[in-house]
């Protein structure tokens, strides 16, 4: 596990390169425009970061970051976005995001059974193979909508459905162990948005998970019991630990509204809030496209919600994307989730947007077909 953490970025780059090669071999389908508009504005934000780092920071790092982010966008364009041509591939896209959570949770569960304090915990909070507990929380919460889709979409009770439910319970428990209030908000937001029109299904899921936790938690060893209480206390704290950072970011933006605060290191550093971090670091140059990206994501959420009302057959698919985007956007106000270039929040945002665009494209195609049929009569 320690070796995985130490070599995580190189392994990710290798996998990214393999996906690029695989994507290049994929033929075009019926969809022509594959990249959702919000991603273009996210690219504009990265361009602002690149320019500032290039002019005032480390030139080598600027080009490396730009190349990495460009490769991620190209991978999404050639791979997942192009593969989305039918319902089967949509479900594969959701499955792939869920499997990120499965691999992460089960790998760290295995490590915890061997030695709970090696790698998986730092300062009493779960971090897994990530850099800190906030990163772990963002990864775990970002996969919750996909688990709910896989559970609700499988009508019959079998081992596969039990596996997804068990995985969601494990994801939820590790999310609790991060002690991250941001992660808790993201997870709760995703659940509420997913079941926004089906309160009965939400109650059944909560009761089922509650029963499973009541059975499983007493079976955990004493080390887990000693960890639970200090972590639980973090969720009842009312202290705003980010107020000083937010105030500093706001003042940095007010003092340098066009291009942000002067760069004092080799690269830009971000934290605590996507919007304030972008404003403080890049000024209006990066803040404006970031806001447009956020508004574009909200516009997609509204369009998908309306789609689920008009065509209930797409309720599960639409709810997965709506809850996924809501989850990430809610977390963006307390963590700089969208300003990285090779992070799970950025990649999952692109995947959710690509999945959402596919659903809207399908709806547009169906509407055009129905219009054509009416003109033929």
Where are these regions (language model features)?
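Alpha-helical transmembrane segments of multi-pass inner-membrane proteins
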Residues: 50, 91-118, 131-197, 295-303, ...
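Hydrophobic core segments of transmembrane alpha-helices in multi-pass, intramembrane catalytic enzymes
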Residues: 9-19, 63-77, 111, 134-150, ...
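Transmembrane alpha-helical segments and their membrane-water interfaces
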Residues: 17-30, 44-45, 49-106, 146, ...
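Transmembrane alpha-helices of multi-pass inner-membrane enzymes
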Residues: 18-19, 321-331, 336-377
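Transmembrane signal-anchor hairpin modules in multi-pass inner-membrane enzymes, especially those
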Residues: 1-54, 87-91, 95, 151-160, ...
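TM-adjacent membrane-interface loops and short helices in multi-pass inner/ER membrane proteins
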Residues: 236-278, 282-289
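Hydrophobic transmembrane alpha-helices and their immediate junctions
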Residues: 158, 195-196, 284-329, 362
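Flexible juxtamembrane loops connecting transmembrane helices in multi-pass membrane enzymes
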Residues: 123-126, 214-247, 265-266
């Amino acid at each position: 596990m320690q070796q995985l953490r130490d070599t995580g970025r190189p392994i990710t780059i290798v996998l990214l390169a393999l996906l690029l090669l695989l994507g290049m071999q994929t033929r075009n389908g019926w969809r022509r425009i594959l990249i959702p508009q919000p991603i273009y504005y996210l690219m504009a934000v990265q361009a602002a970061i690149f320019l500032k780092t290039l002019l005032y920071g480390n030139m080598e790092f600027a080009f490396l970051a730009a190349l990495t982010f460009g490769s991620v966008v190209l991978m999404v364009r050639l791979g997942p976005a192009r593969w989305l041509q039918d319902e089967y591939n949509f479900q594969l896209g959701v499955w792939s995001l869920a499997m990120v959570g499965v691999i992460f949770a089960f790998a760290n569960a295995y490590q915890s059974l061997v030695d709970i304090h090696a790698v998986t915990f730092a300062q009493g909070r779960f971090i897994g193979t990530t850099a800190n507990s906030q990163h772990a929380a963002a990864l775990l919460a970002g996969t919750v909508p996909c688990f709910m889709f896989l559970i609700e979409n499988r009508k019959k009770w079998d081992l596969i459905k039990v596996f997804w439910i068990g995985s969601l319970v494990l994801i939820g428990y590790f999310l609790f162990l991060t002690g991250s209030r941001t992660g808790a908000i993201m997870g709760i937001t995703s659940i509420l948005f997913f079941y926004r029109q089906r309160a009965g299904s939400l109650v059944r899921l909560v009761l089922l998970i509650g029963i499973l936790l009541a059975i499983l938690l007493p079976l955990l060893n004493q080390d887990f019991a000693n960890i639970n209480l200090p972590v639980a206390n973090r969720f009842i704290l009312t202290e705003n630990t980010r107020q000083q950072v937010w105030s500093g970011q706001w003042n940095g933006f007010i003092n340098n509204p066009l291009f942000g605060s002067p760069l004092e290191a080799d690269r830009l550093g971000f934290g605590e809030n996507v919007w304030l971090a972008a404003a403080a670091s890049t000024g209006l140059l990066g803040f404006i496209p970031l806001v447009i990206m956020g508004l574009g994501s909200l516009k997609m959420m509204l369009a998908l919600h309306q789609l689920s009302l008009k065509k209930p057959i797409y309720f599960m698919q639409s709810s997965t994307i709506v809850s996924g985007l809501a989850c990430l956007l809610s977390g963006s106000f307390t963590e700089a989730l969208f300003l990285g270039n090779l992070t799970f929040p950025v990649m999952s945002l692109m995947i959710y947007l690509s999945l959402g665009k596919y659903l809207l494209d399908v709806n547009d195609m169906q509407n055009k077909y129905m219009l054509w049929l009416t003109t033929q009569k």
